[in-house]
């Protein structure tokens, strides 16, 4: 049994425009066409869906840090071989609660599964799949939801909407003119290469923050609950820095408590670069898989950190346990039409520095 995991899936404005034909119809399949054979080689594929499908009326992606992608991305991912999308990430409320709910609806409409966000408190906050008698539980959690910038705070009584490892950050209260100016600047300004490296998006002081303990306890209870129902528990964790070269203290803290809490594997994303894959006790850890789909040099971008590469991770499962893994290196490049697409990398010299990051 082979279960594969992609890095973060984002669609930038240039990619969207490059996928519109002369009749105004969108087709995102060219972005994934060259990596489709790799995805087809797995029995089940999980993608990190770091955008929303909130609809045209909510406004499509136009800034570097706020995402909403046309619905046509979902059938393209299904066509490429993706089966399950993790939806707990810092962009899940980029278009508010309505956008998050519509995203789930569209995922289901297109024959895909999801985990990480929920429509109702009655829904399970993890997904269990039975693969020929081996039950695997998939959980997805995020460190936050960009609430400081998008201003969305989960209403009281709706904490089921997304799986969080800590409380949401308080929104920044700025005068209206500053908010408008900031939004306009994000649209017209070009990214500054090298200006956005962060070791962790959560301060190291929060490792000992008592406010987080309730969230962590609920997460660990969920892991134990899933462990009662499944043979293998896989945590898809959205946490970390940005373009960082090592795992930050807060995210390492999460790795520690999740592995000690009984998860069999942790699949990390969010860093927008690749980070080490290793065994931590009885838990397999992939710290960060990188960018599976995005536009190099566009939006929030840093040079010199191999951000255009990602690791397509495949876990091999036999006898109801993880028995090994394989990594295929992928790269986001621009084709002859200027469209940023994802391709497999087969050149050993090019692969070597990425493999070094994964050690």
Predicted regions located by residue number:
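Acidic, metal/ion-coordinating pockets
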Residues: 1-359
């Amino acid at each position: 049994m082979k279960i594969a995991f992609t890095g973060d899936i984002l669609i930038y404005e240039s990619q969207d425009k490059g996928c519109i034909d002369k009749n105004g119809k969108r087709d995102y399949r060219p972005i994934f066409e060259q990596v489709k054979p790799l995805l087809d080689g797995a029995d089940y594929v999980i993608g990190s869906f770091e955008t929303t499908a909130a609809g045209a009326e909510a406004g499509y992606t136009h800034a570097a840090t706020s995402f909403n992608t046309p619905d046509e991305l979902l059938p393209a991912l299904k066509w490429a071989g993706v089966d399950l999308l993790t939806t707990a990430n810092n962009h899940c409320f980029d278009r508010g609660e309505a956008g998050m709910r519509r995203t789930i609806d569209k995922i289901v409409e297109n024959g895909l599964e999801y985990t990480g966000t929920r429509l109702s408190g009655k829904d399970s906050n993890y997904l269990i799949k039975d693969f020929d008698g081996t039950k695997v539980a998939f959980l997805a959690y995020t460190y936050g939801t960009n609430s400081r910038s998008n201003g969305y705070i989960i209403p009281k009584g709706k904490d089921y909407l997304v799986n969080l490892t800590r409380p949401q950050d308080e929104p920044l209260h700025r005068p209206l003119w500053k908010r408008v100016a900031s939004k306009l600047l994000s649209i017209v300004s070009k990214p500054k290469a090298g200006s956005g490296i962060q070791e962790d998006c959560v301060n190291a002081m929060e490792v000992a923050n008592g406010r987080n303990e309730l969230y962590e306890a609920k997460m660990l209870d969920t892991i134990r609950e899933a462990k009662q129902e499944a043979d293998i528990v896989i945590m898809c964790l959205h946490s970390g820095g940005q373009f960082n070269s090592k795992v930050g203290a807060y995210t390492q803290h999460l790795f520690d408590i999740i592995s000690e809490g009984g998860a069999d594997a942790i699949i990390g994303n969010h860093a927008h670069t690749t980070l080490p894959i290793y065994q931590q006790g009885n838990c397999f850890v992939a710290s960060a898989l990188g960018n599976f789909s995005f536009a190099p040099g566009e939006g929030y971008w840093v040079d010199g950190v191999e951000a255009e590469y990602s690791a397509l991770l495949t876990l091999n499962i036999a006898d109801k346990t993880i028995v090994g893994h394989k990594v295929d290196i992928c790269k986001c490049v621009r084709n002859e039409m200027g469209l940023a697409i994802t391709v497999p990398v087969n050149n050993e010299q090019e692969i070597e520095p990425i493999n070094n990051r994964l050690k």
